[in-house]
From Swiss-Prot:
Entry keyword annotation includes Transport: yes
Protein name: Autophagy-related protein 16
Gene: ATG16
Subunit structure: Homodimer. Part of the ATG5-ATG12/ATG16 complex. Several units of each may be present in this complex.
Family: Belongs to the ATG16 family.
Coiled-coil portions: 47-164
Cellular compartment(s): Preautophagosomal structure membrane
Organism: Meyerozyma guilliermondii (strain ATCC 6260 / CBS 566 / DSM 6381 / JCM 1539 / NBRC 10279 / NRRL Y-324)
Keywords, in A-Z order: Autophagy, Coiled coil, Membrane, Protein transport, Transport
UniProt cross-references to CDD domains, sorted A to Z: Atg16_CCD
Topological relation to the membrane, as annotated: Peripheral membrane protein
UniProt function note: Stabilizes the ATG5-ATG12 conjugate which is necessary for autophagy. The ATG5-ATG12/ATG16 complex is required for efficient promotion of ATG8-conjugation to phosphatidylethanolamine and ATG8 localization to the pre-autophagosomal structure (PAS). Also recruits ATG3 to the PAS. Involved in endoplasmic reticulum-specific autophagic process and is essential for the survival of cells subjected to severe ER stress.
Amino acid sequence: MTEDWGGDILARLKLRDDLESRDSKYFEAFDLLRRKKVIKGTSGDPDVAAENERLIEKLNNLAIEVEKKDSQISKLKRQLSVAEKTIKSHQNKLENLALEVQEKNKNIEIVNDEVLMNQIQTAVLQKKLGELTKENETLVKRWMDRVSSEAQQMNDANQFLESMRKTSG
């Protein structure tokens, strides 16, 4: 049962009352015919009485058949209503999923753009790193050459001083 079981019971009782009140005219007509038959008694033509009995039986059967068909129609209408609600729910779910897919596709595009931008930045930075590494090697070589030259000059000066000391001394 659903959460609103009281409402379900009331709805079913109302449906039953509606069905009974709708068919009450048939029951009243049958009752009237029955009373007329009792009043007339057994007088009259037996063939007519038999025909009336047969017609009353046929009318009763048709009334029962109409009631069954009405019940089936009501049941089918309820099933149709449930099916329509289910379809609507699934359509809403499908629309929500489509929107979610669109949003995710946009997010994927953004991420792809960011990845591409990062790859470009990485390439630029690697190029800059290569240039700076080359420049650093050049500067280190120049510095080493200069230090080596200064060391050689100091060695030459020391040798000169040494040789001057030896000759003067």
